[in-house]
Amino acid sequence: MAAKVDVKSLPACPAETTLTLISDKWKVLILRDLMPGTKRFGELKKSIGSVSQKVLTAQLRDMEQNGLVHREVFAEVPPRVEYSLTELGRSLKPILDAMWNWGEEFKARNA
């Protein structure tokens, strides 16, 4: 279960709070890649590309702690770990969609 975020330590501005939670480049890509559904660590690493294993692990742990990502460990040999978005993580879809649309429009205007 994700640890409760200390709301008092977050910025007063809601937009800044959102940026605090997802502003890292890798976090946005993790959200993008988990929107369609559950993925294993290796699948995430492959789909994101140039992120190191250490950084991806740290980002996933941070997102899990903030309640955006659910990590499920299966007692198998070899061990299997799957990541999925929580309801809170999925609630970021409209924000990611808006970022996607804005990026498409920006590229079209500057082509």
Tell me the role of every PLM-derived stretch:
Residues 1-10, 17-19, 107-111:
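HhH-family (HhH-GPD) DNA N-glycosylase catalytic core used in base-excision repair
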Residues 9-55, 79-82:
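N-terminal helix-turn-helix DNA-binding core of bacterial DNA-binding proteins
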Residues 15, 96-103, 107:
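Hydrophobic alpha-helical core bundles mediating ligand binding, dimerization, or RNAP-core interactions
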Residues 59:
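Residues within the DNA-recognition helix of helix-turn-helix
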Residues 75-99:
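Basic, amphipathic "hinge/linker" alpha-helix immediately C-terminal to the N-terminal HTH DNA-binding motif
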